[in-house]
C-alpha cells in the first residue's frame, strides 16, 4: 500500500486510465467484429459505414497511444482489402 499522497493519487489515476483503456479496446474489437460480419454478409454499404467508424476509432486510439500508429494503419489497410474483396467476388 502506498504511503505518500502522490503515490495514492497515482494509483487512483492508473485505475481510471486502465478502465477507460479497457472500454476503448472493447469498442475497437466490437467495431472490427461488426465490420467482418458486414463483409461476410456481402453488404458493401454497411461495411463502408462501419469501416468509417472503425477507422476513426483506430486513429483516435493511436493518437492517445492506446495502440501504435502503425498498428492502426495496418488494421485499416487489411480491412480495406477485405472490403475491396467484396467487389471482386461480386464481379
From Swiss-Prot:
Pfam families: Ribosomal_S20p. GO terms for biological process: translation. Residues 1-26 are annotated as: Disordered. SUPFAM superfamilies: Ribosomal protein S20. Keywords: Ribonucleoprotein, Ribosomal protein, RNA-binding, rRNA-binding. The keyword Ribosomal protein applies. InterPro entries: Ribosomal_bS20, Ribosomal_bS20_sf. GO terms for cellular component: cytosol; small ribosomal subunit. GO terms for molecular function: small ribosomal subunit rRNA binding; structural constituent of ribosome. Binds directly to 16S ribosomal RNA. Belongs to the bacterial ribosomal protein bS20 family. This is Small ribosomal subunit protein bS20. It comes from Leptospira biflexa serovar Patoc (strain Patoc 1 / ATCC 23582 / Paris).
Amino acid at each position: 500500500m502506498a504511503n505518500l499522497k502522490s503515490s495514492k493519487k497515482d494509483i487512483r489515476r492508473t485505475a481510471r486510465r486502465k478502465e477507460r483503456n479497457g472500454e476503448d479496446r472493447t469498442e475497437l474489437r466490437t467495431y472490427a467484429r461488426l465490420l467482418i460480419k458486414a463483409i461476410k454478409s456481402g453488404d458493401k454499404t454497411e461495411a463502408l459505414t462501419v469501416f468509417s467508424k472503425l477507422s476513426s476509432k483506430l486513429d483516435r486510439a493511436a493518437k492517445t497511444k492506446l495502440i501504435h500508429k502503425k498498428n492502426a494503419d495496418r488494421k485499416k489497410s487489411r480491412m480495406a482489402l477485405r472490403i475491396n474483396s467484396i467487389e471482386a467476388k461480386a464481379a
